[in-house]
């Protein structure tokens, strides 16, 4: 599957790849999804076919994530995606800029790309080149990461209310599970931020950008610098809430241990009483004395157990 875009009046317009394309020089972005397929075969225009074939057949160095060679500038960057369990995951996108055209190759749809392509009419390319388009995508990526951090903040506030209440111990399992999930997302956000920072620094170092794009790239770097402390605070807050939850759980466990001690005290007391070797013990002469003692021990242990179970203390 391909998404092909032309530049007209500094705006991007999607092209239907089955149509005849007459302005190949204005093609600025070819977005390839699942590039291992043979979808380029149905594109009728020979020159466009060669462009896409070039991108699919060129040898991409899988171990080097940022490099420049005769085929152009190459950047291998991470973006958020969702796996089959609808969990957030980091997936790779290959970027190549060759002859003024941006080629992107990815295995599936990413929220950032869908978001950007959905509102193309709002994106004005001032310089109208592939580098500006690449910076646009990284900016949208940062906006998405910012939204994720804000969502984590909101979720942590809700979890904080549950944990600090200290009265809903039965909900702590879910709270601790949610904290672990948020911590995992936080680490992936950090990886994305550092990865984007490296990619933009590489772009600045390897390409002589116009002054406006140089400033644009530096603004994105500054935004990353501002987001990193917020992401670090997420880890601090998660650690604090986890320790608080574990503290309440330990208190509850100690309380339950005390309750168990109380539960087994009555039958132990009864058993100890009838274990005394005194000569005068009327119950020893009763034919029903032993069964009565056993029943009394069972009832004295069972009654507190049922009561504590009813109170959700066990």
UniProtKB/Swiss-Prot annotation:
Q: Which residues cross the membrane?
A: 256-276, 288-308
* Keyword field: Cell inner membrane, Cell membrane, Ion transport, Magnesium, Membrane, Transmembrane, Transmembrane helix, Transport
**GO molecular function per UniProt:** cobalt ion transmembrane transporter activity; magnesium ion transmembrane transporter activity; nickel cation transmembrane transporter activity
Residue span of motif Probable selectivity filter = 275-277
Main location per UniProt? Answer: membrane
Q: Where is this site: Essential for ion permeation?
A: 254
Give the membrane topology.
Multi-pass membrane protein
Listed under catalytic activity are: Mg(2+)(in) = Mg(2+)(out)
The cross-references to Pfam families, in alphabetical order and at most eight, read: CorA (PF01544)
InterPro entries, per database record: CorA_cytoplasmic_dom, CorA_MIT, CorA_TM1_TM2, Mg/Co-transport_prot_CorA, MgTranspt_CorA/ZnTranspt_ZntB
Where, subcellularly, is it found? Cell inner membrane
Family, per entry: Belongs to the CorA metal ion transporter (MIT) (TC 1.A.35) family.
NCBIfam families for this protein: corA
How are the domains described in the entry? The central ion permeation pathway is formed by the first transmembrane domain from each of the five subunits. Mg(2+) binding strengthens interactions between subunits and leads to the formation of a symmetrical homopentamer surrounding a closed ion permeation pathway. Low Mg(2+) concentrations trigger both a conformation change within each subunit and a loosening of the interactions between subunits. This results in an open ion conduction pathway. In addition, this results in a less symmetrical shape of the whole complex.
The UniProt subunit note reads as follows: Homopentamer. In the absence of Mg(2+), interactions between subunits are weakened, and dimers, trimers and tetramers can be observed in vitro.
Please explain the role this protein plays, according to its UniProt record: Mediates influx of magnesium ions. Alternates between open and closed states. Activated by low cytoplasmic Mg(2+) levels. Inactive when cytoplasmic Mg(2+) levels are high.
UniProt-recorded name of the protein: Magnesium transport protein CorA
What is the species of this protein?
Blochmanniella pennsylvanica (strain BPEN)
Q: Lineage in the entry?
A: Bacteria, Pseudomonadati, Pseudomonadota, Gammaproteobacteria, Enterobacterales
């Amino acid at each position: 599957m391909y998404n092909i875009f032309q530049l007209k009046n500094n705006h991007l317009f999607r092209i239907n790849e089955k149509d005849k394309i007459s302005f190949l020089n204005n093609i600025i972005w070819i977005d390839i999804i699942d590039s291992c397929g043979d979808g380029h075969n149905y594109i009728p225009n020979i020159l466009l076919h060669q462009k896409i074939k070039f991108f699919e057949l060129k040898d991409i160095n899988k171990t080097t994530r940022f490099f420049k060679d005769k085929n152009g500038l190459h950047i291998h960057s991470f973006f958020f995606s969702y796996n089959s369990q609808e969990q957030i995951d980091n997936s790779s996108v290959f970027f190549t800029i060759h002859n003024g055209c941006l080629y992107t190759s990815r295995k599936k749809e990413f929220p950032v790309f869908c978001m950007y392509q959905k509102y193309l009419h709002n994106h004005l390319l001032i310089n109208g080149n592939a580098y500006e388009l690449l910076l646009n995508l990284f900016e949208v990526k940062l906006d998405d990461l910012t939204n994720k951090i804000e969502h984590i903040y909101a979720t942590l506030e809700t979890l904080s209310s549950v944990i600090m209440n200290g009265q809903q111990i039965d909900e702590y399992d879910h709270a601790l599970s949610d904290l672990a999930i948020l911590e995992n997302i936080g680490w992936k956000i950090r990886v994305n931020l550092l990865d984007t920072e490296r990619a933009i620094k590489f772009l600045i170092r390897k390409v002589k950008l116009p002054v406006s794009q140089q400033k644009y790239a530096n603004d994105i770097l500054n935004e990353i610098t501002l987001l990193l402390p917020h992401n670090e605070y997420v880890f601090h807050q998660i650690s604090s809430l986890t320790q608080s939850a574990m503290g309440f759980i330990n208190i509850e466990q100690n309380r339950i241990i005390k309750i168990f001690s109380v539960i087994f005290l009555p039958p132990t007391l009864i058993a100890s009483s009838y274990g005394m070797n005194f000569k005068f013990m009327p119950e020893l002469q009763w034919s029903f004395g032993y069964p009565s003692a056993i029943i009394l021990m069972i009832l004295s242990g069972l009654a507190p157990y049922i009561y504590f179970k009813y109170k959700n203390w066990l």
